[in-house]
Structures are given as structure tokens and as C-alpha cells.
Amino acid sequence: MLIPRKVKHRKQHHPSLRGRAKGGTSVHFGEYGIQALESAYVTNRQIEAARIAMTRHIRRGGKVWINIFPDRPLTKKPAETRMGSGKGSPEWWVAPVKAGRVMFELAGVPEPVAKEALRRAIHKLPMKCKVVKREAGE
């Protein structure tokens, strides 16, 4: 699981998900990638499930890059608790992903295998995504 080793503050404000991503919107490392079409919080479990879905399909070949990291804690109060008495305890770690962000990249496998592996990974993510190919000039 992806979680930060050490954090300065245990609880944080929720980051805004409005607008489009400013950076990380093109494929840099691999040949193919998964680009978010909507904004959402992606948990560490969803990132791991997508990674496993990709690597199982490509078997031994290829290389996978994960361009997002869950560094923001989301808190939750226990069930049947009265309101007040402070903020809840941190429950899980999320990566705030804005629309347009390339989250995963893949290289070293044929195009049909890469597209199928990325399609399987998209099913594990909480937002609409598309498979993008590296452009010639990059």
C-alpha cells in the first residue's frame, strides 16, 4: 500500500477538485497512459488494484509508472456518533486527481496488450478515464 512515511500534520483540509490539472497532462515516461476525464479522490487501495490489474495482464514484459501518490488523509467520524467534539480520525489516504491528469503510464509491450491492460486498470478507478498514446514530439 502507498502511504506517506511521515507527515507534518495528521489531519488536513480537503483539497479542491475544481478545474483541470495544470501539470502532468501528457505521457512522459512510457508509451501509453491513463488520463482522468473527471476529478476525484483516488485511494491507495484503488491505485494498488489498478497496478495489479495492469501487471497481471502484461505478465513479465513492460514497465509501469505510477504518477500519483496518496499523500492526503481523509478523516471520518465513527458510526452513530453525535456531531461536534472535533474532527474525526484519519481513515484512508487519497491522491486528489484533477481532470486531465495522466495517472499511470506503460511501456515495453505491444499496443493491443497495453490498451487491454490499461482498460482493465480503468475499471478499478473511481472516475471516467481514457487511454492516451504518447505524441510524436514528446
Swiss-Prot record:
Gene Ontology process terms (BP): translation
Gene3D superfamilies assigned to the protein according to its UniProt record, in alphabetical order: Ribosomal protein L10e/L16 (3.90.1170.10)
Biased composition (Basic residues): 1-21
Stored SUPFAM superfamilies: Ribosomal protein L16p/L10e
Keyword entries, A-Z: Ribonucleoprotein, Ribosomal protein, RNA-binding, rRNA-binding, tRNA-binding
GO cellular component assignments: cytosolic large ribosomal subunit
PROSITE patterns named in the record: RIBOSOMAL_L16_1 (PS00586), RIBOSOMAL_L16_2 (PS00701)
InterPro entries xref list: Ribosomal_uL16 (IPR047873), Ribosomal_uL16_bact-type (IPR000114), Ribosomal_uL16_CS (IPR020798), Ribosomal_uL16_dom (IPR016180), Ribosomal_uL16_sf (IPR036920)
Region Disordered, annotated ranges: 1-22
UniProt GO MF annotations: rRNA binding; structural constituent of ribosome; tRNA binding
Pfam families: Ribosomal_L16
Keyword tRNA-binding set for record: yes
Entry keyword tRNA-binding: yes
General function of this protein: Binds 23S rRNA and is also seen to make contacts with the A and possibly P site tRNAs.
Assembly and interaction partners: Part of the 50S ribosomal subunit.
Protein family per UniProt: Belongs to the universal ribosomal protein uL16 family.
UniProt protein name: Large ribosomal subunit protein uL16
Gene that encodes it: rplP
